[in-house]
Amino acid sequence: MPLSYQHFRKLLLLDDGTEAGPLEEELPRLADADLNRRVAEDLNLGNLNVSIPWTHKVGNFTGLYSSTVPIFNPEWQTPSFPKIHLQEDIINRCQQFVGPLTVNEKRRLKLIMPARFYPTHTKYLPLDKGIKPYYPDQVVNHYFQTRHYLHTLWKAGILYKRETTRSASFCGSPYSWEQELQHSQRHGDESFCSQPSGIPSRSSVGPCIRSQLNKSRLGLQPHQGPLASSQPGRSGSIRARAHPSTRRYFGVEPSGSGHIDHSVNNSSSCLHQSAVRKAAYSHLSTSKRQSSSGHAVEFHCLAPSSAGSQSQGSVSSCWWLQFRNSKPCSEYCLSHLVNLREDWGPCDDHGEHHIRIPRTPARVTGGVFLVDKNPHNTAESRLVVDFSQFSRGITRVSWPKFAVPNLQSLTNLLSSNLSWLSLDVSAAFYHIPLHPAAMPHLLIGSSGLSRYVARLSSNSRINNNQYGTMQNLHDSCSRQLFVSLMLLYKTYGWKLHLYSHPIVLGFRKIPMGVGLSPFLLAQFTSAICSVVRRAFPHCLAFSYMDDVVLGAKSVQHRESLYTAVTNFLLSLGIHLNPNKTKRWGYSLNFMGYIIGSWGTLPQDHIVQKIKHCFRKLPVNRPIDWKVCQRIVGLLGFAAPFTQCGYPALMPLYACIQAKQAFTFSPTYKAFLSKQYMNLYPVARQRPGLCQVFADATPTGWGLAIGHQRMRGTFVAPLPIHTAELLAACFARSRSGAKLIGTDNSVVLSRKYTSFPWLLGCTANWILRGTSFVYVPSALNPADDPSRGRLGLSRPLLRLPFQPTTGRTSLYAVSPSVPSHLPVRVHFASPLHVAWRPP
């Protein structure tokens, strides 16, 4: 007969009123391999091979990799981005505020001014892959919403726009490391020429032709080239070679189609620029053809913005405007839409500043698509950037590691009687500037509407030689496209034309979706909080990623602190969202926890999720191990607040490791659900003096409680770690002390997942809330009793205990970077790696 739930609780000594014998007899039984095996069989924990089909869904949990079907919202609003410009002299400003910075703070702030990203390999994808066809039924809507989002980011100074192979434009205030083209005159031939009078500054290519001519005639000196920097010594930071003058320049705008055209296209020049250009073309088309294996240069027209100035020349190259002169092919022909307005605005948009960049191809390195901003806000969209190539395969980059505060450290740090508020940093990632040299690696964009629609519609063929014909122009006309564009015209107006052109954008601020970004953000906010803490030593400021919290003794004090800190952050160029400032009172909500003076508990929404999970959890049905991963993820978060902690979940971990289905028996489910229905806070550790010590040998245990000594023997020899754990449990139950000295590192770590399962669960409950102090064996007063010698009494140790705040120390004082240590020697661990069903 399977083990009943009541018997199981009694076995684990979880019920107070059990008629069990003394702990010294009962606990060692739980370490018995035979008992653990019988219990595992009774609870069906060891039976991993099942023939019944697996269950792939439990409540909201599906397998880890089965994606939920995303829902497209045609009404999505593109969020607005403030003009974020982090001050370049951030270190000086912090020093004015708080005095000299520590080594650590300086190092962290230098890391992000500017951030650098140089992967060894980068895979370039065609522009067609720029916008992912994530919503097959809403292709056109998704295309324009995404293009509008990208345009918004570019206008806010978050993206660069690739103008030519070696130049980019952006909006917003420039940084010193962004070399403006106009200002590089000092290097003579090396510079891109500044704008000649009479040619609007909109044109990215026209003004630069003469300097191109000079280059191709004179050849480049080795130290010059499109990358030589305007300041000596700066060129090294760009990390790219100066290329000979035979470099091919392709604009982003392919003539009329998405393919790159290797011929000089005179007809595409705007009329008032054609004179300048023809002179240039006659030279370029010959010299470049000979020097670069038949590839000519293509210059594209960028129509000026003035109304009605679209000349015939520009129309012929623009897919959108070609419809104006063509005969409608049907009632759903796009020419009906294009003829709705006279002025469709420019084909292209240019930023306030033009800078030089390393050679950047008209390609992308990652795709983008839109999703809901978050589960609670489905009205706004969020851009997802997929740079997963940098996390896998040959292009993999190993990201730097950083400390995440653990629960106990967080509680020690924040569990206090302070009054709290949390600040919301708007678009935190987009505060940190990225060096332009990283642009070629982080490219996003789109191949233009014609190409995008052609790729997705079955009837059109993308053949380079067909794009000239009118018939081919109308291949993309369809009822669905026409209806979609008419609806979008109401929203975007003339911008439909702008967005239908191809574009390549690079990141000017760090993107989400690259493993470097969370690391840099964590470094940045922790350095800022460190500065704030030193400026206001009687208060507490703490951050994790973009979540910044401030604590002060009283509400009035907190409000004045809030004003001072907000003004300081604004002076650095950090944008706060005042509407989202939350005042928590004396219990802080942070990182999914509620932290008060009594300790820490999980937030209510997580508790509700757990209750829902147990309601939906099927009994006696094998559950797919991927679903188990989701269940363990949720339960693992709240495990430290339960009686038995992580050890209770070990059977689940074992099945995930074996990639086998797991079957919940009624008893095991009842045991877990009871564990999670009563959550106990994790309390703050207090400093104190340790006066209780435990030690063990494989055959016996010994305790030193004050001046009192105790010893005992085990019925059978036990593994040393198990014996030490039992001794610690006896010390806690005999003395009630919350501070115990031990010389065993495994007990000290308080990770009991590697012990026999029943013992691990019970020990976790007995030792919950206990702090351990390391005492070397030679000084351990319990060492002699454990060896059976009570006569020799060593002098009583008074070991001080100081609670740790882990790597998240309050003051950012850290040693300088250590020199490279030799490779460590790994010894085989005497512990089992994980719990396995016997």
UniProtKB/Swiss-Prot annotation:
- Kindly state which reaction or reactions the protein catalyses: DNA(n) + a 2'-deoxyribonucleoside 5'-triphosphate = DNA(n+1) + diphosphate; Endonucleolytic cleavage to 5'-phosphomonoester
Tell me the GO BP annotations in alphabetical order: DNA replication; symbiont-mediated suppression of host innate immune response
- For region Terminal protein domain (TP), the annotated ranges are 1-179
Q: Where is this region: Disordered?
A: 219-245
Can you provide one Gene Ontology molecular function annotated for this UniProt record? metal ion binding
What residues does Mg(2+) bind to? 424, 546-547
Record text on activity regulation:
Activated by host HSP70 and HSP40 in vitro to be able to bind the epsilon loop of the pgRNA. Because deletion of the RNase H region renders the protein partly chaperone-independent, the chaperones may be needed indirectly to relieve occlusion of the RNA-binding site by this domain. Inhibited by several reverse-transcriptase inhibitors: Lamivudine, Adefovir and Entecavir.
Site positions for Priming of reverse-transcription by covalently linking the first nucleotide of the (-)DNA, renumbered to this chain?
A: 65
Its keywords, alphabetically, are:
DNA replication, DNA-binding, DNA-directed DNA polymerase, Endonuclease, Host-virus interaction, Hydrolase, Inhibition of host innate immune response by virus, Inhibition of host RLR pathway by virus, Magnesium, Metal-binding, Multifunctional enzyme, Nuclease, Nucleotidyltransferase, RNA-directed DNA polymerase, Transferase, Viral immunoevasion
Which portions of the sequence form the region Polymerase/reverse transcriptase domain (RT)? 342-685
Could you tell me which residue ranges the Reverse transcriptase domain spans?
352-595
Task: Please list where the region (Spacer) is annotated.
Answer: 180-341
Q: What is its EC number?
A: 2.7.7.7, 2.7.7.49, 3.1.26.4
User: Regarding domains, what does the record say?
Assistant: Terminal protein domain (TP) is hepadnavirus-specific. Spacer domain is highly variable and separates the TP and RT domains. Polymerase/reverse-transcriptase domain (RT) and ribonuclease H domain (RH) are similar to retrovirus reverse transcriptase/RNase H. The polymerase/reverse transcriptase (RT) and ribonuclease H (RH) domains are structured in five subdomains: finger, palm, thumb, connection and RNase H. Within the palm subdomain, the 'primer grip' region is thought to be involved in the positioning of the primer terminus for accommodating the incoming nucleotide. The RH domain stabilizes the association of RT with primer-template.
User: To which protein family does this belong?
Assistant: Belongs to the hepadnaviridae P protein family.
PANTHER family xrefs: PEPTIDASE A2 DOMAIN-CONTAINING PROTEIN-RELATED, POL PROTEIN
In terms of HAMAP family, this protein maps to:
HBV_DPOL
Functional description taken from the UniProt entry: Multifunctional enzyme that converts the viral RNA genome into dsDNA in viral cytoplasmic capsids. This enzyme displays a DNA polymerase activity that can copy either DNA or RNA templates, and a ribonuclease H (RNase H) activity that cleaves the RNA strand of RNA-DNA heteroduplexes in a partially processive 3'- to 5'-endonucleasic mode. Neo-synthesized pregenomic RNA (pgRNA) are encapsidated together with the P protein, and reverse-transcribed inside the nucleocapsid.
User: Other remarks on record?
Assistant: Hepadnaviral virions contain probably just one P protein molecule per particle.
The name of this protein is Protein P
- Give the organism the record lists: Hepatitis B virus genotype A2 subtype adw (isolate Japan/Nishioka/1983) (HBV-A)
